[in-house]
A protein has these predicted regions:
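C-terminal motif of bacterial Sec signal peptides marking the signal peptidase cleavage site
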Residues: 2-5
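Short, low-complexity, disordered segments immediately C-terminal to signal peptides
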Residues: 7-28
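Intrinsically disordered, low-complexity repeat tracts enriched in Pro/Ser/Thr
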Residues: 16-19, 37, 41, 47-50
Length: 267
């Protein structure tokens, strides 16, 4: 508003300007204090989230442990793949890395408690299967206090590099990739396959090829993790060769990178 419209004298304007400046300074200071408090709170929460109990390995110690040796880790459930006959397969992560837990001992009652963010302490044996480092079948766990959801990490630029495996099993993103043709059982070009060889049907795993910078990779929708009622399953079924897509999922490994995709967006 103009000064005339306000109907104030110069003295009133000066007083009002001083008051406004004081108020603005106080507001700015309060906002700065609040931001600092929020940051401190976040850092404290992250420190708590990353603090290990006595006898529990850090992620670095876990990765350095020999295959087939006993490991004890603490991590936070990010997703559940499946439960069957008191066995649960879990995607878990902490501040430093991720742990794939295959067929751990788990009652149906406990499985229901494992919502995303739940902290668990796992005791089992480290193993490797076709390049995938995991905690082997038969591990046990106990639920602990604490919660943490890992942020997504964009690893698009790491595709085709030796560094990518350092993010194995983490929740990651791939951006701007192109859908490439797969060949079905009759030799036709298709955007996806049911099972790796096209032998499956609706409800089975989906396999699809995507490329970046001239290199093609095979990604998967794991049907136990994301079944045929999920958005991602149906999004992949509707892909077209040549589509440009962004994706999120877990950086699984099988004879090379083979992510388990949980989200697809066509650009």
């Amino acid at each position: 508003l103009s000064l005339g419209a306000c109907g104030n004298s110069n003295g009133d304007v000066a007083a009002e300007s001083t008051a406004a400046a004081t108020t603005e300074a106080a507001t700015t200071e309060a906002a700065t204090t609040e931001a600092a408090a929020t940051e401190a709170s976040t850092e404290a929460a992250e420190a708590v989230a990353d603090e290990k109990s006595e006898g529990v390995m850090t992620y670095e110690e876990y990765m350095a442990a020999d295959l087939d040796s006993e490991v004890v880790i603490e991590a936070y459930v990010q997703a559940k793949q499946s439960w069957w006959e008191d066995k649960a397969t879990l995607y878990t992560q902490d501040q430093d890395g991720a742990y794939f837990i295959y067929n751990s001992v788990c009652s149906e009652e406990d499985y229901a408690k494992l919502v995303p963010g739940t902290k668990i302490k796992v005791t089992g044996y480290k193993t490797e299967w076709s390049g995938e480092v995991e905690i082997a079948e038969g591990a046990t766990f106990e639920i602990e206090e604490g919660s943490y959801i890992a942020p997504v990490t964009d690893v698009t630029d790491l595709l085709g590099t030796d560094d990518l495996i350092n993010y194995q099993n983490q929740f990651v993103a791939f951006k701007g990739m192109t859908v490439e043709a797969s060949q079905d059982a009759t030799g036709n070009d298709v955007a996806f396959l049911y099972n790796y060889d096209g032998s499956g049907e609706d409800g089975n795993d989906l396999y699809f090829n995507v490329s970046l910078n001239g290199q093609t990779y095979t990604f998967t929708v794991e049907s136990y993790l994301c079944d045929n009622t999920t958005d991602v399953y149906n999004a992949v079924k509707n892909l077209k060769i040549g589509d440009t897509i962004d994706m999120e999922g877990f950086l699984y490994w099988y004879e090379g990178v083979n992510p388990h995709i949980t989200s697809v967006t066509v650009k």
